[in-house]
A protein has these predicted regions:
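Active-site region of the double-stranded beta-helix
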Residues: 59-91, 101-117, 124-128, 207
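Catalytic core of Fe(II)/2-oxoglutarate
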Residues: 154-211
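Catalytic core of non-heme Fe(II) oxygenases with the double-stranded beta-helix
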Residues: 98-172, 205-207
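A structural signal for short, well-ordered beta-strand segments
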Residues: 95-97, 120-122, 195-199
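Short hydrophobic/aromatic beta-strand or adjacent loop that forms the aromatic wall/cage
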Residues: 7-11, 117, 192-194
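Short clusters of hydrophobic/aromatic residues that line enzyme substrate/ligand-binding pockets
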Residues: 52, 133, 183
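Non-heme Fe(II)/2-oxoglutarate
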Residues: 1-88
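Solvent-exposed residues in well-ordered beta-strands and their adjoining turns
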Residues: 17, 123-125, 198-202
Length: 211
């Protein structure tokens, strides 16, 4: 019997540690500003359970080389899936850095980013003691009809409804914008910081009016 897999959820990942040092340095001011914006909240409730988000990074030239790299890789990611990218212009809709609270509790509940074609993560500060991304089964029909898995299964199998990746500094992950994802609760043992981005593929006839 032939085993065929159709309609896969494609996730790319690689290790690119060469960006870590410069992007951590460039990110420090953004995380500092994000914490200052939350100063009153921290004073009242403490530094627990928070995720400190930066302002947009799309126009900061300290991130230019990285932005060009992930922009090209995101284009290649779509092209690899068979899309006719000669008809589309890829545009960053969002690019930001964030850091979880030092005293722990930082997390993201499961979500998607509306009207995006490519999403991605690049990890700047993390370890086996920090949070990590969790991805969920994107097919509604499959989620509705899941069965109980065998108790001794190891690894990721087609029947699983979610899986996680354990990154290290320099890990880059690219995935479809429709893929639901979340971040496990961080315990505040070691710093956790990462860059997140979203990209839209806009028809060139439309893109020429906005670029």
């Amino acid at each position: 019997m032939f085993i065929n897999s159709y309609f896969p959820t494609v996730i790319w990942s690689e290790e690119k540690p060469e960006f870590v040092k410069s992007l951590n340095k460039a990110s420090n001011k953004y995380i500092s500003d994000a914490r200052k914006r939350e100063k009153e909240f921290i004073k009242k409730h403490g530094d627990f359970g928070r995720s400190y988000h930066s302002a947009p990074l799309t126009v900061d030239n300290d991130f230019l080389d990285f932005r060009n790299y992930i922009g090209q890789k995101s284009w290649e990611y779509l092209d690899h899936q068979g899309y006719d990218m000669s008809q589309y212009q890829t545009i960053f809709s969002e690019l930001w850095v964030q850091e979880f609270a030092k005293k722990g509790g930082g997390h993201h509940s499961a979500h998607i980013h509306w009207n995006q074609h490519v999403s991605g993560f690049y990890f700047l500060k993390c370890s086996d003691k920090t949070s990590y991304p969790i991805f969920h089964e994107p097919k509604t029909g499959a989620r509705c009809t899941k069965l109980k898995m065998k108790p001794d299964m190891k690894g990721v199998w087609p029947g699983h409804e979610q899986f996680h990746l354990k990154p290290k500094p320099g890990t880059l992950i690219i995935f479809p914008g429709y893929l639901e994802h979340e971040y496990a609760v961080d315990f505040g043992i070691e710093p956790f910081r990462f860059i997140h981005w979203n990209i839209q593929a806009v028809p060139k006839e439309m893109a020429k009016d906005v670029l």
